[in-house]
């Protein structure tokens, strides 16, 4: 799927070592309806320093409207912003 790069609201948890884990996120679709997505499991977390912009990418197994989905979220450290990069399935 092509990159969406949609800004999202995220509730995340940080452990004692500072590692973040998204718990749920909310986004607005093209019809301006809000959707809340419950993250069941973070399958992968990787750090990237592309062109000097430090970011974390999270591959999340989640549930939206009773259906299981796979999403990729991005957290940009410098701006403290979250984005929904893509919905994989």
Outline where the language-model segments fall.
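Cysteine-centric segments in proteins
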Residues: 1-89
């Amino acid at each position: 799927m092509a990159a969406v790069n949609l800004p999202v609201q995220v509730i995340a948890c940080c452990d004692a070592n500072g590692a973040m884990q998204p718990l749920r996120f909310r986004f607005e679709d093209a019809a301006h309806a809000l959707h809340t997505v419950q993250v069941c499991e973070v399958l992968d977390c990787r750090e990237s320093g592309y062109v000097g912009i430090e970011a974390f990418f999270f591959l999340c197994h989640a549930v939206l409207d009773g259906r299981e989905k796979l999403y990729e979220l991005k957290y940009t450290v410098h701006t403290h912003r979250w984005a929904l990069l893509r919905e994989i399935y």
